[in-house]
Amino acid sequence: MDIDELQINFLHLETVDSTNNFVKQHHAELDDFTLVYADIQTAGRGRLDRTWISRQGNFFGTLLMKKLANPFLGTMVVSLAALDALKSLAPEVPVWLKWPNDLYIDECKAAGILSESIVQADKSRAIAVGLGVNLAWESSELAQIDKPAASVGNGKINPGKFASELAKYAKMYYIMGIACSEKLFELWHKRNDLVGMDLILELGNQEFVQGVAAGIAPDGALILRDVSGVEKRYYCGDVSVNRESVRKALELRKRS
């Protein structure tokens, strides 16, 4: 597919329960590569059905991709596009990609992604990739969130402008994913700054693993090297990093 052949479609809603829910319910009548975004979500959600707080002024949207069936590919498309869009609109902010589906500033979460299959007759027919980006939170509001969070742009980035930038970059990565998913993964892995960082991985039930992110496997698994040098793969979990580790890793990336 040529990049000029793919049309970008936007649908702007004032209020919706969840943009992912909307796209999954209406995918049949929506065109491929439609970006649905809303001013307010009343039931926004993230990974593991966690609540995504959705105040007006921030970005909440879902991209429908009918030519991809693997949710992991969708995560790569949208995370790379979101990273490029934020670097374009706020080049002074050190945003970085964190496995499995987040964008961070230092050790604080600035954006999250939820990629879901749209299944019909027991077969994945398309994917709906939701993205929430903190654009307008005040520092006092961020302090009330139970995990470290950050906002990009201090309310200066309009959600509609961000939607346009996001779609522009997503178009390029979507076509790349259709043509050669291996190339998309290679680029995503290269730009995933978690690799090389010291981290703690929470597996649930009060179980934690500490080590260094040695890489990410093509199927999306995090390769973690523990203190004894043994590498294991993990497909889910919550990653925690400290500011010193983040800054050290990002500085090494700049030099390489």
What are the residue ranges of the model-derived segments?
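N-terminal lobe of the biotin/lipoate ligase/transferase fold
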Residues: 1-91, 109, 118, 254-256
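Gly/Ser-rich oxyanion-binding loop with an adjacent helix/lid
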Residues: 98
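Long, positively charged amphipathic alpha-helical accessory segments at protein N-termini or as interdomain linkers
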Residues: 5, 69-71, 76-95, 105-256
